[in-house]
Amino acid sequence: LHLDHGTYEGCYKCIKAGFTSIMFDGSHYPIDENVAKTKELVAVAHAMGMSIEAEVGSIGGEEDGVVGMGECADPDECKRVADLGVDMLAAGIGNIHGKYPANWQGLSFETLDAIQQKTGVMPLVLHGGTGIPADMIKKAIDLGVSKINVNTECQLSFADATRKYIEAGKDLEGKGFDPRKLLAPGAEAIKATVKEKMELFGSVGKA
């Protein structure tokens, strides 16, 4: 059970609640404070047998009601956080949460390459996977990205399938209003999206 974009306080709550993995998002703190809090949480999480992901460089878009512009992380700051012993590192490389605007400049592979050179074998995480072109995804993987988060695209697939079910009047046929039936098309749509992403990411058969 993983916590995504957790606050300092939220991480402690999830540690106590028995989560198996946490992500501490300290990207909005000055780097020294981010390092200090991350170091503390690494020690606590590892003592509990949990994995921990950290973030450097704020990832733009909207996540849990917070809106921001994508920025590129400083590779040297990434190394400082990676050296703390985190299990995964999320670094801003121009990626954002949610839908990408028409004027999006794309991922900064120069930044990603520099981060990979500084952090070595550290598994890198790409947030905001929705809408990134397949060729960019594959290049990011080649440059060290090991985990890609895709949320908005799954939600859009769910909403579209559920909308079609209701617009077709299926909820008015028999017991089509049963939540298990009403929500089933959306769930299947998410499965299809996940399968598509697994094939693109090269993660099929690696569970």
Regions found by a protein language model. Name each.
Residues E167-D178:
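Active-site gating loops and adjacent loop-to-helix segments of metal-dependent hydrolytic enzymes
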